[in-house]
Protein backbone atom coordinates (compact mmCIF):
# COMPACT_ATOMS: atom_id res chain seq x y z
CA UNK A 1 0.00 0.00 0.00
CA UNK A 2 1.40 3.44 -0.93
CA UNK A 3 1.82 6.06 1.79
CA UNK A 4 -0.72 8.46 0.29
CA UNK A 5 -3.26 5.64 -0.01
CA UNK A 6 -2.74 4.64 3.63
CA UNK A 7 -3.13 8.27 4.70
CA UNK A 8 -6.36 8.42 2.74
CA UNK A 9 -7.53 5.24 4.46
CA UNK A 10 -6.73 6.68 7.87
CA UNK A 11 -8.55 9.92 7.07
CA UNK A 12 -11.66 8.02 5.96
CA UNK A 13 -11.45 5.83 9.03
CA UNK A 14 -11.14 8.77 11.40
CA UNK A 15 -14.32 10.28 10.00
CA UNK A 16 -16.09 6.93 10.04
CA UNK A 17 -15.04 6.19 13.61
CA UNK A 18 -16.89 9.19 14.95
CA UNK A 19 -20.14 7.44 14.13
CA UNK A 20 -19.19 4.00 15.39
CA UNK A 21 -19.49 3.29 19.11
CA UNK A 22 -17.50 0.08 18.89
CA UNK A 23 -14.26 2.00 18.51
CA UNK A 24 -11.68 3.42 16.18
CA UNK A 25 -9.65 0.36 15.34
CA UNK A 26 -12.64 -1.71 14.29
CA UNK A 27 -13.33 0.89 11.64
CA UNK A 28 -9.65 0.78 10.66
CA UNK A 29 -10.11 -2.88 9.83
CA UNK A 30 -13.21 -2.16 7.75
CA UNK A 31 -11.58 0.23 5.36
CA UNK A 32 -8.17 -1.43 5.28
CA UNK A 33 -9.82 -4.70 4.29
CA UNK A 34 -11.33 -2.83 1.35
CA UNK A 35 -7.86 -1.55 0.40
CA UNK A 36 -6.33 -5.03 0.10
CA UNK A 37 -8.29 -7.95 -1.30
CA UNK A 38 -5.46 -10.37 -2.07
CA UNK A 39 -5.35 -13.13 0.55
CA UNK A 40 -2.34 -12.85 2.84
CA UNK A 41 -0.87 -15.08 5.55
CA UNK A 42 -2.39 -14.78 8.98
CA UNK A 43 -0.96 -12.65 11.77
CA UNK A 44 0.00 -14.74 14.81
CA UNK A 45 -0.38 -12.99 18.16
CA UNK A 46 0.55 -14.82 21.35
CA UNK A 47 -1.76 -14.81 24.37
CA UNK A 48 -0.47 -16.18 27.66
CA UNK A 49 -2.09 -16.33 31.08
CA UNK A 50 -3.69 -18.59 33.71
CA UNK A 51 -6.66 -20.12 31.92
CA UNK A 52 -7.00 -22.99 34.40
CA UNK A 53 -6.32 -23.20 38.11
CA UNK A 54 -6.88 -20.72 40.96
CA UNK A 55 -5.97 -17.64 38.90
CA UNK A 56 -8.33 -18.50 36.04
CA UNK A 57 -11.01 -16.21 37.48
CA UNK A 58 -9.10 -13.27 36.05
CA UNK A 59 -7.05 -15.08 33.40
CA UNK A 60 -10.09 -16.25 31.43
CA UNK A 61 -11.74 -12.80 31.31
CA UNK A 62 -8.44 -11.37 30.05
CA UNK A 63 -8.34 -14.03 27.31
CA UNK A 64 -11.99 -13.44 26.45
CA UNK A 65 -11.47 -9.69 26.14
CA UNK A 66 -8.54 -10.23 23.78
CA UNK A 67 -10.51 -12.81 21.78
CA UNK A 68 -13.53 -10.51 21.58
CA UNK A 69 -11.42 -7.73 20.10
CA UNK A 70 -9.63 -10.05 17.67
CA UNK A 71 -12.93 -11.51 16.47
CA UNK A 72 -14.38 -8.04 15.92
CA UNK A 73 -11.34 -7.04 13.88
CA UNK A 74 -11.43 -10.28 11.87
CA UNK A 75 -15.15 -9.85 11.19
CA UNK A 76 -14.29 -6.73 9.22
CA UNK A 77 -11.45 -8.26 7.25
CA UNK A 78 -8.69 -8.40 9.82
CA UNK A 79 -5.54 -6.34 9.54
CA UNK A 80 -5.09 -5.28 5.90
CA UNK A 81 -6.93 -8.41 4.84
CA UNK A 82 -4.90 -10.68 7.10
CA UNK A 83 -6.75 -12.64 9.75
CA UNK A 84 -5.48 -12.40 13.32
CA UNK A 85 -4.84 -15.80 14.89
CA UNK A 86 -4.33 -16.02 18.64
CA UNK A 87 -1.73 -18.54 19.81
CA UNK A 88 -2.99 -19.30 23.31
CA UNK A 89 -0.83 -20.62 26.15
CA UNK A 90 -2.08 -21.55 29.63
CA UNK A 91 0.68 -20.74 32.14
CA UNK A 92 -1.41 -22.09 35.07
CA UNK A 93 0.00 -19.24 37.22
CA UNK A 94 3.25 -21.21 37.38
CA UNK A 95 6.49 -19.28 36.67
CA UNK A 96 8.31 -22.30 35.26
CA UNK A 97 5.41 -23.21 33.00
CA UNK A 98 5.13 -19.60 31.92
CA UNK A 99 8.79 -19.49 30.93
CA UNK A 100 8.51 -22.68 28.88
CA UNK A 101 5.40 -21.45 27.09
CA UNK A 102 6.96 -18.05 26.42
CA UNK A 103 9.84 -19.81 24.71
CA UNK A 104 7.30 -21.77 22.67
CA UNK A 105 5.67 -18.52 21.53
CA UNK A 106 9.04 -17.27 20.32
CA UNK A 107 9.63 -20.55 18.48
CA UNK A 108 6.19 -20.26 16.87
CA UNK A 109 7.18 -16.81 15.56
CA UNK A 110 4.39 -14.69 16.99
CA UNK A 111 4.62 -11.02 16.04
CA UNK A 112 3.79 -9.87 19.56
CA UNK A 113 2.28 -11.28 22.72
CA UNK A 114 -0.45 -10.06 25.06
CA UNK A 115 -0.62 -11.57 28.50
CA UNK A 116 0.40 -12.43 32.05
CA UNK A 117 -1.86 -12.06 35.05
CA UNK A 118 0.60 -13.06 37.77
CA UNK A 119 3.54 -10.78 38.48
CA UNK A 120 5.91 -13.60 39.43
CA UNK A 121 5.09 -15.55 36.27
CA UNK A 122 5.62 -12.52 34.10
CA UNK A 123 8.91 -11.58 35.75
CA UNK A 124 10.42 -14.97 34.99
CA UNK A 125 9.51 -14.70 31.30
CA UNK A 126 10.41 -11.08 30.53
CA UNK A 127 13.92 -11.89 29.31
CA UNK A 128 12.48 -14.23 26.68
CA UNK A 129 10.55 -11.43 25.00
CA UNK A 130 13.16 -8.72 25.56
CA UNK A 131 16.07 -10.78 24.21
CA UNK A 132 14.12 -11.85 21.13
CA UNK A 133 12.75 -8.35 20.54
CA UNK A 134 9.13 -9.45 20.63
CA UNK A 135 6.79 -6.79 22.06
CA UNK A 136 4.83 -7.93 25.10
CA UNK A 137 1.73 -6.05 26.25
CA UNK A 138 0.64 -6.90 29.80
CA UNK A 139 -3.09 -6.18 30.31
CA UNK A 140 -3.55 -7.89 33.66
CA UNK A 141 -0.55 -8.23 36.03
CA UNK A 142 0.11 -5.06 38.03
CA UNK A 143 3.41 -5.66 39.83
CA UNK A 144 5.51 -2.51 39.49
CA UNK A 145 8.77 -4.29 38.51
CA UNK A 146 7.29 -5.66 35.26
CA UNK A 147 7.76 -2.45 33.30
CA UNK A 148 10.79 -1.30 35.30
CA UNK A 149 13.21 -4.17 34.67
CA UNK A 150 14.78 -2.68 31.54
CA UNK A 151 15.65 0.91 30.62
CA UNK A 152 12.45 2.33 29.18
CA UNK A 153 13.95 3.31 25.84
CA UNK A 154 15.19 -0.24 25.27
CA UNK A 155 12.20 -2.07 26.73
CA UNK A 156 9.86 -4.27 24.69
CA UNK A 157 7.54 -4.63 27.71
CA UNK A 158 4.33 -2.56 27.63
CA UNK A 159 1.31 -2.55 29.92
CA UNK A 160 -2.39 -1.57 29.87
CA UNK A 161 -3.12 -2.40 33.52
CA UNK A 162 -2.58 -0.06 36.48
CA UNK A 163 0.78 -0.78 38.06
CA UNK A 164 0.83 -1.08 41.82
CA UNK A 165 3.09 1.93 42.20
CA UNK A 166 0.02 4.07 41.36
CA UNK A 167 -2.62 1.80 42.93
CA UNK A 168 -0.95 1.74 46.37
CA UNK A 169 -0.74 5.53 46.91
CA UNK A 170 -4.24 5.94 45.46
CA UNK A 171 -5.63 3.68 48.18
CA UNK A 172 -3.31 4.98 50.93
CA UNK A 173 -4.29 8.58 50.23
CA UNK A 174 -7.94 7.62 50.51
CA UNK A 175 -7.65 5.78 53.81
CA UNK A 176 -5.62 8.62 55.34
CA UNK A 177 -8.41 11.04 54.40
CA UNK A 178 -10.81 8.71 56.20
CA UNK A 179 -8.65 8.79 59.32
CA UNK A 180 -7.44 5.20 59.01
CA UNK A 181 -3.80 5.84 59.77
CA UNK A 182 -2.76 2.72 61.66
CA UNK A 183 -2.19 0.28 58.83
CA UNK A 184 -1.57 -3.45 59.05
CA UNK A 185 -0.23 -4.91 55.80
CA UNK A 186 -0.94 -8.53 54.87
CA UNK A 187 1.16 -9.50 51.83
CA UNK A 188 1.71 -12.92 50.29
CA UNK A 189 5.19 -14.23 49.52
CA UNK A 190 4.83 -14.14 45.71
CA UNK A 191 6.47 -11.56 43.47
CA UNK A 192 3.17 -9.69 43.51
CA UNK A 193 3.01 -9.57 47.29
CA UNK A 194 6.67 -8.62 47.64
CA UNK A 195 6.44 -5.73 45.18
CA UNK A 196 3.08 -4.62 46.56
CA UNK A 197 4.40 -4.51 50.12
CA UNK A 198 7.18 -2.17 49.03
CA UNK A 199 4.74 0.05 47.14
CA UNK A 200 2.42 0.35 50.16
CA UNK A 201 5.31 1.10 52.51
CA UNK A 202 6.56 3.78 50.11
CA UNK A 203 3.08 5.31 49.89
CA UNK A 204 2.79 5.33 53.69
CA UNK A 205 6.21 6.97 54.01
CA UNK A 206 5.01 9.75 51.72
CA UNK A 207 2.25 10.33 54.28
CA UNK A 208 4.81 10.22 57.12
CA UNK A 209 3.38 6.90 58.31
CA UNK A 210 4.71 3.41 58.93
CA UNK A 211 2.73 0.16 59.09
CA UNK A 212 1.94 -0.85 62.65
CA UNK A 213 2.14 -4.51 61.65
CA UNK A 214 3.26 -6.56 58.63
CA UNK A 215 2.22 -10.18 58.00
CA UNK A 216 3.73 -12.37 55.27
CA UNK A 217 2.18 -15.66 54.20
CA UNK A 218 2.33 -18.28 51.46
CA UNK A 219 -0.40 -18.89 48.92
CA UNK A 220 -2.82 -21.56 50.02
CA UNK A 221 -2.95 -20.52 53.67
CA UNK A 222 -6.37 -21.15 55.19
CA UNK A 223 -5.99 -19.57 58.62
CA UNK A 224 -4.46 -16.20 59.47
CA UNK A 225 -6.16 -15.75 62.83
CA UNK A 226 -2.91 -15.44 64.79
CA UNK A 227 -1.60 -12.77 62.45
CA UNK A 228 -4.91 -10.92 62.63
CA UNK A 229 -4.82 -11.03 66.43
CA UNK A 230 -1.30 -9.60 66.36
CA UNK A 231 -2.43 -6.82 64.02
CA UNK A 232 -5.31 -5.99 66.34
CA UNK A 233 -2.98 -5.92 69.33
CA UNK A 234 -0.68 -3.56 67.41
CA UNK A 235 -3.57 -1.10 67.20
CA UNK A 236 -4.32 -1.37 63.49
CA UNK A 237 -7.51 0.35 62.35
CA UNK A 238 -7.32 -0.85 58.72
CA UNK A 239 -5.98 -3.94 56.95
CA UNK A 240 -4.23 -3.45 53.60
CA UNK A 241 -4.03 -6.84 51.87
CA UNK A 242 -1.79 -7.71 48.92
CA UNK A 243 -2.54 -11.11 47.44
CA UNK A 244 -4.34 -12.31 44.31
CA UNK A 245 -6.06 -15.45 45.49
CA UNK A 246 -8.61 -16.66 48.04
CA UNK A 247 -6.24 -15.56 50.81
CA UNK A 248 -7.99 -12.18 50.66
CA UNK A 249 -11.17 -13.97 51.71
CA UNK A 250 -9.27 -15.81 54.46
CA UNK A 251 -8.36 -12.41 55.88
CA UNK A 252 -11.94 -11.13 55.65
CA UNK A 253 -13.47 -14.20 57.27
CA UNK A 254 -10.76 -14.16 59.92
CA UNK A 255 -11.58 -10.58 60.87
CA UNK A 256 -15.24 -11.48 61.07
CA UNK A 257 -14.56 -14.53 63.25
CA UNK A 258 -12.59 -12.36 65.67
CA UNK A 259 -15.32 -9.76 65.75
CA UNK A 260 -12.70 -7.25 64.64
CA UNK A 261 -14.63 -4.58 62.76
CA UNK A 262 -11.92 -2.81 60.81
CA UNK A 263 -12.01 -2.14 57.07
CA UNK A 264 -10.07 -4.14 54.50
CA UNK A 265 -8.55 -2.30 51.54
CA UNK A 266 -6.19 -3.18 48.71
CA UNK A 267 -5.46 -3.27 45.03
CA UNK A 268 -7.70 -4.63 42.32
CA UNK A 269 -7.72 -8.30 43.51
CA UNK A 270 -10.33 -7.31 46.10
CA UNK A 271 -12.73 -7.17 43.14
CA UNK A 272 -12.10 -10.83 42.25
CA UNK A 273 -14.76 -13.54 42.82
CA UNK A 274 -12.32 -15.38 45.10
CA UNK A 275 -12.75 -12.47 47.52
CA UNK A 276 -16.22 -11.11 46.81
CA UNK A 277 -17.87 -14.54 46.74
CA UNK A 278 -15.39 -16.32 48.99
CA UNK A 279 -15.60 -13.68 51.70
CA UNK A 280 -19.40 -13.44 51.48
CA UNK A 281 -20.76 -10.76 53.85
CA UNK A 282 -17.30 -10.39 55.42
CA UNK A 283 -16.16 -8.87 52.12
CA UNK A 284 -18.77 -6.11 52.20
CA UNK A 285 -17.31 -2.65 52.55
CA UNK A 286 -13.87 -3.55 51.20
CA UNK A 287 -12.29 -0.80 49.11
CA UNK A 288 -10.02 -1.28 46.11
CA UNK A 289 -8.46 0.59 43.17
CA UNK A 290 -10.21 0.06 39.83
CA UNK A 291 -9.77 1.20 36.23
CA UNK A 292 -13.08 -0.23 35.06
CA UNK A 293 -16.30 -1.05 36.90
CA UNK A 294 -18.88 -3.08 35.00
CA UNK A 295 -21.61 -0.48 34.82
CA UNK A 296 -22.92 0.83 31.47
CA UNK A 297 -21.85 4.38 32.31
CA UNK A 298 -21.44 5.39 28.68
CA UNK A 299 -22.15 4.01 25.23
CA UNK A 300 -18.69 2.54 24.69
CA UNK A 301 -18.75 0.55 27.90
CA UNK A 302 -22.37 -0.50 27.48
CA UNK A 303 -21.56 -1.88 24.03
CA UNK A 304 -18.53 -3.77 25.34
CA UNK A 305 -20.44 -5.31 28.26
CA UNK A 306 -23.39 -6.32 26.09
CA UNK A 307 -21.17 -7.86 23.42
CA UNK A 308 -19.10 -9.77 25.98
CA UNK A 309 -22.19 -11.17 27.72
CA UNK A 310 -23.68 -12.29 24.41
CA UNK A 311 -20.47 -13.77 23.03
CA UNK A 312 -19.47 -15.73 26.12
CA UNK A 313 -22.99 -16.44 27.40
CA UNK A 314 -22.48 -14.95 30.86
CA UNK A 315 -24.61 -12.67 33.00
CA UNK A 316 -21.59 -10.88 34.41
CA UNK A 317 -17.83 -10.81 33.87
CA UNK A 318 -15.96 -12.37 36.81
CA UNK A 319 -13.18 -9.74 36.66
CA UNK A 320 -14.29 -6.90 34.36
CA UNK A 321 -10.98 -5.01 34.58
CA UNK A 322 -9.05 -7.95 33.13
CA UNK A 323 -11.49 -8.29 30.24
CA UNK A 324 -11.60 -4.59 29.41
CA UNK A 325 -7.84 -4.11 29.63
CA UNK A 326 -7.23 -7.17 27.45
CA UNK A 327 -9.75 -5.89 24.92
CA UNK A 328 -8.09 -2.49 24.73
CA UNK A 329 -4.62 -4.06 24.50
CA UNK A 330 -5.59 -5.99 21.37
CA UNK A 331 -6.93 -2.90 19.66
CA UNK A 332 -3.93 -0.78 20.68
CA UNK A 333 -1.63 -3.40 19.17
CA UNK A 334 -3.53 -3.59 15.87
CA UNK A 335 -3.71 0.18 15.68
CA UNK A 336 0.06 0.37 16.13
CA UNK A 337 0.52 -2.18 13.34
CA UNK A 338 -1.57 0.02 11.08
CA UNK A 339 0.81 2.88 11.78
CA UNK A 340 3.75 1.01 10.23
CA UNK A 341 4.12 2.59 6.79
CA UNK A 342 6.38 0.06 5.07
CA UNK A 343 4.55 -3.09 6.28
CA UNK A 344 7.65 -4.07 8.28
CA UNK A 345 6.27 -6.27 11.07
CA UNK A 346 9.59 -7.10 12.73
CA UNK A 347 9.76 -6.66 16.49
CA UNK A 348 11.71 -3.37 16.51
CA UNK A 349 9.26 -1.84 14.02
CA UNK A 350 6.25 -2.91 16.13
CA UNK A 351 7.95 -1.53 19.26
CA UNK A 352 8.53 1.80 17.52
CA UNK A 353 4.92 1.88 16.33
CA UNK A 354 3.59 1.25 19.84
CA UNK A 355 5.73 4.12 21.10
CA UNK A 356 4.59 6.53 18.39
CA UNK A 357 1.74 9.00 18.43
CA UNK A 358 -0.94 7.57 16.17
CA UNK A 359 -4.57 8.48 15.74
CA UNK A 360 -6.60 8.36 18.95
CA UNK A 361 -8.08 5.00 19.93
CA UNK A 362 -11.34 5.35 21.81
CA UNK A 363 -11.11 2.43 24.20
CA UNK A 364 -13.25 0.93 26.93
CA UNK A 365 -10.98 1.72 29.87
CA UNK A 366 -9.60 4.99 28.51
CA UNK A 367 -9.24 7.22 25.48
CA UNK A 368 -5.74 6.49 24.23
CA UNK A 369 -4.21 9.47 22.42
CA UNK A 370 -0.72 8.06 22.91
CA UNK A 371 -0.67 5.14 25.36
CA UNK A 372 3.11 4.62 25.17
CA UNK A 373 6.28 6.52 24.37
CA UNK A 374 9.94 5.54 24.23
CA UNK A 375 10.26 6.70 27.84
CA UNK A 376 6.92 5.44 29.22
CA UNK A 377 5.64 1.89 28.77
CA UNK A 378 2.56 2.15 31.04
CA UNK A 379 -0.72 3.24 29.46
CA UNK A 380 -2.64 3.79 32.70
CA UNK A 381 -2.15 6.89 34.86
CA UNK A 382 -3.48 7.69 38.33
CA UNK A 383 -6.25 9.98 37.06
CA UNK A 384 -7.91 6.94 35.45
CA UNK A 385 -8.37 5.16 38.79
CA UNK A 386 -11.63 5.09 40.70
CA UNK A 387 -12.37 3.62 44.11
CA UNK A 388 -14.48 0.49 44.08
CA UNK A 389 -16.40 -0.94 47.02
CA UNK A 390 -17.89 -4.37 47.63
CA UNK A 391 -21.59 -4.01 48.35
CA UNK A 392 -24.10 -6.85 48.51
CA UNK A 393 -21.83 -9.22 46.63
CA UNK A 394 -20.91 -6.86 43.79
CA UNK A 395 -18.36 -4.15 43.07
CA UNK A 396 -19.64 -0.63 42.52
CA UNK A 397 -18.37 2.91 42.89
CA UNK A 398 -17.38 3.92 46.40
CA UNK A 399 -18.05 7.59 45.69
CA UNK A 400 -20.93 9.17 43.73
CA UNK A 401 -18.48 11.66 42.21
CA UNK A 402 -16.48 8.77 40.74
CA UNK A 403 -19.63 7.39 39.16
CA UNK A 404 -20.34 10.79 37.62
CA UNK A 405 -16.74 11.21 36.46
CA UNK A 406 -16.92 7.76 34.91
CA UNK A 407 -19.50 9.01 32.43
CA UNK A 408 -16.53 10.50 30.60
CA UNK A 409 -13.72 8.14 29.63
CA UNK A 410 -10.41 9.45 31.00
CA UNK A 411 -7.26 10.28 29.06
CA UNK A 412 -3.65 9.75 30.05
CA UNK A 413 -2.05 12.50 32.11
PLM segments and residue spans:
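Extracytosolic ligand-binding ectodomains
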Residues: 2-5, 33-413
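Bacterial N-terminal signal peptides
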Residues: 18-30
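N-terminal secretory signal peptides that target proteins for export/translocation
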Residues: 1-15
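Hydrophobic alpha-helical segments, especially transmembrane helices
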Residues: 13-15, 19, 160, 309
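N-terminal twin-arginine translocation
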Residues: 12-13, 30-34
